[in-house]
Amino acid sequence: MNKGFTFKQFHINIGLCGMPVSTDGVLLGAWANIEQSKNILDIGCGTGLLSLMSAQRNENSHVDAVELMPLAAEVALQNFVQSPWKNRLHLIHQDILHYHPAHLYDAIICNPPYFNNGEQSQKGERSIARHTDSLPFDKLLKCCKALMSSKGRASFILPFIEGNQFIEIAKKHSFHLTKLTKIQTTEKKDVSRLLIELSIFPYIYQETTLIIHSKDGYSNDFIQLTRHFYLNMA
């Protein structure tokens, strides 16, 4: 049985839902602009990684984590209760398409599904979480627009091709691309992932590149971004 993953200030139990901790999730959780946000929404929280990272990074925040899958929701709740921030983390077992809170959010974080139905080969909650049939980009963006405050920011991570498709769909929903970080595993590799920030408000656009591995191990940029979370980072 998978025992999960231990970070510097919290532990992620995987349980039976089969959703392992990924580098994608850690990158997004460390990168998202949530430091000044009072109300944060984690869409499709899985085991709760992004919510826990947000709570650690912003001690004044309240995080609502919405998860449809029963096993994942159960595990996320367990992870929240065992964390130092259990009073600021709220698990909502519900379909985000039917979620109607009383307030809007300053920040939204989401590690979206990105495989289409033709690529689906696995079964179970992990498979559902990774396929766009469960939450198509268009519907996800409509939800974000409805749930986000006028100056709020929504942050995502996607593979390069799907990320560019996502950005084009977002423009049709009147979103501005306000921040983009291109991820390369090494300097010689092509861009593999995109960290994407969207907002209805036209913030000044920022674009950067992050290379994960250098010749001697992890790059300094990657270490600086993730050092407050990974146990082996100084």
UniProtKB/Swiss-Prot annotation:
It is found in: Cytoplasm. It catalyses: adenosine(37) in tRNA1(Val) + S-adenosyl-L-methionine = N(6)-methyladenosine(37) in tRNA1(Val) + S-adenosyl-L-homocysteine + H(+). HAMAP family: tRNA_methyltr_YfiC (MF_01872). Gene3D superfamilies: Vaccinia Virus protein VP39 (3.40.50.150). This is tRNA1(Val) (adenine(37)-N6)-methyltransferase. The keyword Transcription does not apply. It comes from the Bacteria. Its main location: cytoplasm. It comes from Aliivibrio salmonicida (strain LFI1238) (Vibrio salmonicida (strain LFI1238)). It is an enzyme of class 2 (transferase). One of its GO terms (biological process) is tRNA processing. The keyword Methyltransferase applies. Keywords: Cytoplasm, Methyltransferase, S-adenosyl-L-methionine, Transferase, tRNA processing. The lineage of its organism: Bacteria, Pseudomonadati, Pseudomonadota, Gammaproteobacteria, Vibrionales.
